[in-house]
Structures are given as structure tokens and as C-alpha cells.
């Protein structure tokens, strides 16, 4: 399945989620700016708040760009669940300085993206359903980071929603969430942009303006 753009994909998901979650004690948590574009029509249709969580991926050096983990906006680092403990130990031993430098740079990028807009307290998520929205999940790295970020928060129900996901990511969603909504599972997942005709993602500033226009502060405080 292919989509004209992320807004169209979000509208399709919104119709699926409207009856169980419309106008309920539910919030949308979008992963990155791509997730924001998918989440916006869902929030408008369901008339529920939309927030965005910032994450930055950490890759190993070299041409193969092995993804080792993800930093969230609290500065917490989560190793990819795809890695074995032996791989983690090897990477830490060989690439410790690189990983630490990338963590620092990731936090600088997240702080620049946040700007002076401030945070929304995690209390905004307490005892709510959370619809976790991505524009596409090739791996579970971002999922693991966001779930670690949400671990202290008492929630009612976790729903994973995305237009596209690999089989591995879907398997991880089954473990991490109470309900999943994936429009198009992919056995051979290409890059996320491949599945959209239009790939005009907003800049960080445009993303902030988009969230503020919806009447919600953009970030959840870590």
C-alpha cells in the first residue's frame, strides 16, 4: 500500500480509531515530525490532544550505519532491542567514545529543536490512553526509546498506530502495546519515504508552529 502523503495516511487511521477513542480520555504521542503529520488528522478527527516526543538515533561509524540505540528528550539512552547483549558489549568496548559523543550531540539537537517553547508535564499523560503514532516503523528502536520514556507514567491503554511497519516492528508492537493499528505490514521494508508520493516534512520550527496552532504545547516533559 502506498499513500499520497502522511496526512492521507493519518486520515485513514483516524477513521479506524474514531469510535473507540474519539472524544475520550486519550492523547496522541507522535514520534518525530513524520509522526506529527500522521497524528494531526487523527487528533482533529478524534478531538483529542496531540503531543510530540523527540528522539535522536545513534549510529555506529562506517558505511553500514548500524543503529545502536536512541536518545530521548530526557537524555536517556536505550540500546536497540535488535542487538544481542554480546553485540552491545562489543560496541561499548570498541565505540565507547563515539557513542558518548553522539549522545551529547543528540541532546544538543533536541534542545535546539525544543527552543524556548517549554514542556508539557507528564501529568498530561497520566491515566490516559496513549496512541503512539509514527509515519513508518522499519525497526523497533524508536519504540523502545519512547516506551522507556513512558515507563514511569501510569496509563490506561497503549495503542500503536502507523501506516507502515516491518514484520519485526509489528512483533515488537505486540509486546509493547495493548493494541496495534498498521495499515500496511511490509515483509521487505524499504525506506519510509518510499511509501509516500509526497515527502515534505516540516522543519523543527514549522513543527512547533503546527502544534501551537492546534492549541497544545509541543513536548512532553521528561
What are these regions (language model features)?
Residues 1-222:
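PRPP-associated nucleotide enzymes
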